[in-house]
Amino acid sequence: AIWSSTLPNGMRIKGIEYGELPLVNFSIELNQGMLLDAPGKVGVAYLTAQMLNEGTVSKTPEQLEEAIGQLGASIRVACSRESMTLSGLCLKKNFARAMELVEEMLLHPRWDEQSFAVVKERAIDNVRQRATEPEAIAQSVFDKALYGAGSVLSENPSGTEASLQSITLDDLKAFYDECFSPKVARMSFVGGFTQSEVEKSLASTGNWPAKDVRQPEIGEDGAEPAGKVLFVDYPGARQSYVLIGSKAMPMRSPEAYPAVIVNDKLGASSGSLLFEILR
């Protein structure tokens, strides 16, 4: 059975009742990602997501990791350009306790200065590593050519070394206060529970108060950059990366999803026509 509902605080839920395996797969996605980062502060959303993995008010990072492990579960928060997603997998018998940990992570983050310093330094190391990878360099050049160097869309969600250096823990707290709300959250669920059982297990999320939050504003100038060919010289690279593309329609367009399907068939996956021809 496939079902959907909305909790009193505004969080939307979609579920698929599937009892073939004793597992539950779930995710909570918020429409709050890198697009809400302020100019010069790209990386705030990314670091906020990372900090939600670093313990809660009542649990250190080690204690949280141990609590998740004791349930035979996995729960992680990640950030993309457009959204922040908590995803998880657990045994059916442990679903209620897993949801208690999810509530702790989302509603009671630890905001520990020492953990923040570690997370920030790790992010800076990742940025430095990307700067040595031909594929990452090619993607960065491509995005700036397509969207314009001044557009937030041309940035990587994890930011730059300069932007990360400028970010403080207070920036993360402000982002959390201004952008987190069940009104912009969607939960997806697949497992051997009925709709009423899932809603009962989520009753405690009523502690997450609904509020209006900032929404990303991306201009639609419709301007398409003139066609061009760009080369990036990277001596010693063992492979060449070729990126070809242009701007597409907004995702709210009725043509967007059919275009995604066609794109996947033509060349976006290992089962695509392009992959089969080249391989």
Per-range role (PLM):
Residues 3-8, 230-233:
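Short acidic-hydrophobic surface loop/beta-edge motif
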Residues 1-5, 144-185, 216-222, 259:
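Histidine-acidic residue clusters that define the catalytic metal-binding segment
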Residues 149, 157, 181-250:
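An aromatic/glycine/proline-enriched structural segment found at the starts
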Residues 266-270, 279:
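Hydrophobic alpha-helix feature that most strongly marks membrane-spanning transmembrane helices
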Residues 104-113, 205-213:
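A common structural junction motif
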